[in-house]
A protein has these predicted regions:
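Alpha/beta-hydrolase-fold enzymes
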Residues: 119-202
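Catalytic active-site module of serine/aspartate enzymes centered on a nucleophile-bearing elbow/loop
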Residues: 267-295
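The serine-hydrolase catalytic nucleophile loop
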Residues: 38-51, 65, 250
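Conserved alpha/beta-hydrolase
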Residues: 52-72
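Short beta-strand/loop motif that positions the catalytic acidic residue
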Residues: 232, 238-240
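Catalytic nucleophile-loop/oxyanion-hole region of alpha/beta-hydrolase
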Residues: 41-45, 68-103, 276-283
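N-terminal cap/lid segment of alpha/beta-hydrolase-fold proteins
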Residues: 1-27, 81, 276
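Conserved alpha/beta-hydrolase "acid-adjacent" motif
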Residues: 245-251
């Protein structure tokens, strides 16, 4: 098992906490930076990816966003896209300064919602030290994601969002909804099998708080990072789950085709299948082969 150490860095005055997995090499090595998707925390199998990257000769930095997991931030479980972008940039700065890291060979790894984050950050910041991006089952188009929920569910989530916003304006605690639920539940993801699939990501004895402040649903439909694909000039691996019922696949396929150096791989599985065996071995293997060509 790879050596793992607890780390923390500052993002906009608050501590983001995470893990650093150090590659067993004497010379400086590239670093892959990873963070989870919608409401996800690092314990949900990000260490499995990090350990695979370390075995391939790369350092790996995994972190929780502010307001989630072990990181600071009040209120808890507040998903703010701008803040998460700030956290990514803070993580990149921090990783560049870690002992043993080749600061000019940084790769970004995002999954689901963060698969869009890493595209937009790399495309807009144009940081020459970021040399590769991986987006796994990524969110690319907000309108498509909202439409996939159906009109009734979209209205229900919109009402919840306005209720949460009203709470904020009155100084009250957030109005929360669950990130995943059964069909018909008031939750962000309610496709058949989602609840069971997410639980497969839990390590033994770990029970995360799977709620989110509902105000995020006023923003999701407007968040379309796929529009930045044509501006991304570095290698970008896009991995799509063909039977994804949570994140629409067509926008990801379209975005990959627009990127000058986009590479698309489609897997015959569902959204959450990519995290676990047998599809995990296939997807992470493709990621490592991609990194070996780029780093």
């Amino acid at each position: 098992m790879a050596h793992r150490q607890d780390i923390q860095f500052i993002s906009e005055g608050l501590k983001c906490k995470g893990w650093f997995f150090k590659a067993p090499c004497s010379e400086k090595a590239p670093c892959v930076i990873l963070a989870h998707g919608f409401c996800g925390v690092k314990e949900l199998r990000l260490s499995a990816y990090a350990e695979a990257f370390v075995e391939a000769g790369y350092h790996a930095l995994v972190f929780d966003y502010r307001h989630f997991g072990d990181s600071e931030g009040e209120p808890r479980l507040l998903l703010d896209i701008k803040k998460q972008h700030q956290d990514w940039r803070a993580a990149i700065r921090f990783a560049k300064g870690l002992p043993g890291v080749d600061s000019h060979r940084i790769a970004l790894w995002g999954t689901s919602f963060s698969g869009g984050h890493v595209l937009q950050i790399a495309a807009t910041d144009q940081d020459p030290d970021i040399v590769a991006v991986i987006s796994q089952a990524p969110h690319m188009n907000g309108f498509a994601t909202a439409a996939a929920s159906g009109p009734v569910q979209s209205i229900r989530l919109g009402i919840a969002a306005w209720r949460d916003l009203a709470n904020m304006l009155m100084g009250r605690s957030p109005y929360y909804v669950h990130s995943c639920g059964f069909p018909g539940d008031l939750a962000a993801m309610t496709a058949p099998g989602v609840v069971e699939a997410v639980k497969k990501l839990y390590p033994p004895g770990f029970e995360p708080d799977e709620r989110v402040a509902a105000r995020i649903f006023l923003s999701v439909g407007l968040y379309s990072p796929g529009r930045f694909a044509k501006r991304l000039g570095i290698p970008w691996l896009v991995q799509v789950a063909a039977r994804d019922l949570t994140t629409p696949v067509k926008p990801a396929i379209k975005a990959a085709g627009k990127a000058p150096k986009g590479e698309l791989i489609i897997y015959e599985c569902g959204h959450f299948d990519v995290y676990v065996s047998p599809h995990f071995q296939q997807t992470v293997g493709d990621q490592i082969r991609f990194l070996k060509r780029c780093l």
